[in-house]
């Protein structure tokens, strides 16, 4: 059976129907899936003139009965998650982490620290973005092998043991609120990173 090719208009109508049911209706999807639907609707217009893109935003919010503030908030979260999925920690993403990304985007001080661009939904400060992702993820650090003079000359150590896994510094959305309190204090951030402890950074 040949694949049916939908026009852009048909695809948009389908997304609106799904949105009425799963965003505005009584069979609501998870925040992530709601955000994905909104993203999918607007994606074809992201390189269009700004006026055309805003018109499609207005069409979407009027059809679904949601506010533009809610629409853009959900798009920020979805796009930040997509950036995480492109990072070195992509395989660690789980739906349970969505609340963390939501809280990040609620904090203007964190958005500023990331150099967040609300027009293109991306972080211009790539170094800080990578640091942030490392705080909410398990990471591996290199461990120097311990010299053992009793070993016979020529013995090789197992390269697989040279790295140790560290647990995430931040695992809960509420912890993002504490992070926002000292995100602009580089000394406190360094303490947090060195100690792998949000609490230690908070009191530094």
Label each PLM-derived region with a short phrase.
Residues 1-77:
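Amphipathic, charge-rich alpha-helical segments that serve as recognition/docking helices
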Residues 58-63, 69, 73, 80-204:
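Accessory, typically intrinsically disordered or conformationally flexible segments
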